[in-house]
Every structure is written in structure tokens, then in C-alpha cells.
Amino acid sequence: MKKVLNIFTIALIIIFAIISCQEGSDSSSSASYSNKVIKVGFAGDSDYQIWNPIVSNLAKEGITVELVTFADYTIPNQALNDGEIDLNAFQHYAYFNDEVSNKGYKLTAIANTYISAMNIYSKKIKSVSEVKKGDKVAIPNDPTNGGRALKVLEAAGLIKVKPEAGDTPSVSDIIENPLNLDIITVDAGGIYSLLPDVACAVINGNYAIDFGLNPGSDYIFKDDPAIYSGNSFVNLIAARTKDKDNELYKKVVAAYQSETVEEIYANNFKGSYLPTWK
């Protein structure tokens, strides 16, 4: 009997030792994360609704994420390239590829997030059929969002652009402008403020939400992803190329590509954001 008790005691010691090692491993894993703050940049304020729950969930794993918001689209890629932030999540592939190609940034897309509607909005008219000759129309001034806006205007029947210009035509690619519209190009984040002064404007989904517009109902013309080719306007998470396989960043991606975020898309963004990782 004594021998049996000794064997039982030894077995318990081994079991507790294994459990202790596992707990120590988990603790050391969390500790290894605690010294690293992952800075994630994005443009506008609407994406806080997405990222705040992600930050909370990652904190439970001992991973600290700091959110950094930028006033416009021209800064987050430079900030990422310069090491001021670790990841950014604000742009689609067309914009990202243009920035990398033209500015030489050493950045890589590490995950897909969503595609966002880019609708036409107005404070003066209820339909694009009410646009008159010589009216002013505002679009973003960067090449990719401006190009996308022109495709939306084309889909609305207001202009026609050269087919060979693809998904990102420029104003010079307009081949038909029957109403002789005055197309004004301004920073994407500043377009909403021009709505009282123009007939209509093409506004990015995140900025529309930031300024209280409902992308599911407030438009006078609704964007249709079918008019674009490939993944040009799918949004992404980017990292510096040298860090594209970083294990911590993979955990951030996993936390983003989750049912929690899908529910936020559906409930908070009124159908404007559609997940693209499935």
C-alpha cells in the first residue's frame, strides 16, 4: 500500500510540474509581448469602432496595440515606411500599389479587410438626374480615389472615360462630358465640407460615416463593386516588407479577421463595409 501511495505521489508531482511548465510558458509568452507596443495607423475616426474591440481582445493576450489616426491619406504610408508606426489599415490596393510604385516605399500588404462603398452624395439634389449643365462636382484629388470617383460618375451616366484607363482614370481621360461638369479635385477628407457649394460629391465610405452620412441610404447614387476589375478597391493591412512575417502582426491580423469585426461591419457601418478575407 505504501508503495502504491508513493507511485501516486510521484505521478501527482509530475502532473503538477507539467501544468506549472505550461503556465510558465504562457506567462513568459505574454511577458515577451508586454515590452512591444504595436502602433496601427488609419485615416479618419470611423475605424475606431473596428479597432477598439481588437485592441481589447489582444490586450487579453498581453499584446498592446496603440491606435494612431491621421487627418488625410497622404501620411500613413510614409509614417509606416519611416518606422513611426508598425502597421496601417486605411487604403485599398489601387492606392497602395500607386504609393509603393511612385514613392519607393518598402511596404507589403499582409491581409485583406473590407471593400467600402464610394457613393455620390448631395445636399442640393435627390438624384443624379437633377445634375444640370455646368454644375460643380467634387472628387478626391489623389490618383486612385480620384480615378475611382470618375468610374462612379461614369456608372451614374454623367461622364465617360477612356476604357484603357482601367480603374483609375484621370480627369484628362474623360472623353464625354455632355453636361460640361466642372469637376473639382480636393483632399478626400475635405470633400464633405464642400457639399453646400457643389451639386454633388463622390465621398469615400469612411469619411462619409465620419461626417454623419449613412452610406446605406443617404446617397443619390450607390457605388457598385461590379464596375471595377480585380481587387483594386479591396482594403488592406500593410507592414514594412522586412516585417511582413512578424508573428505579432499575424496575431493582429487574426484578431481583425474575426466574427467580432464582421458583426461590427454589419451593425455599425450599415452595410457599407463588406469583409473580403473569406
What are these regions (language model features)?
Residues 37, 41-68, 75, 79:
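Short, polar/charged alpha-helical segment
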Residues 117-128, 232-246:
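A bilobed periplasmic-binding-protein/Venus flytrap-type ligand-binding module shared by bacterial periplasmic
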Residues 24-39, 58-60, 128-135:
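Immediate post-signal peptide segment of exported/extracytoplasmic ligand-binding proteins
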Residues 98-110, 124-125, 197, 202, ...:
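Ligand-binding "clamshell"
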Residues 110-159, 262:
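A conserved helix-loop-strand patch within extracytoplasmic ligand-binding domains
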Residues 67-78, 166-193:
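Short helix-initiation/N-cap motifs at beta->coil->alpha
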Residues 1-37:
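Short, low-complexity disordered leader/linker segments with a strong preference
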Residues 145-154, 256-276:
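Periplasmic-binding protein-like
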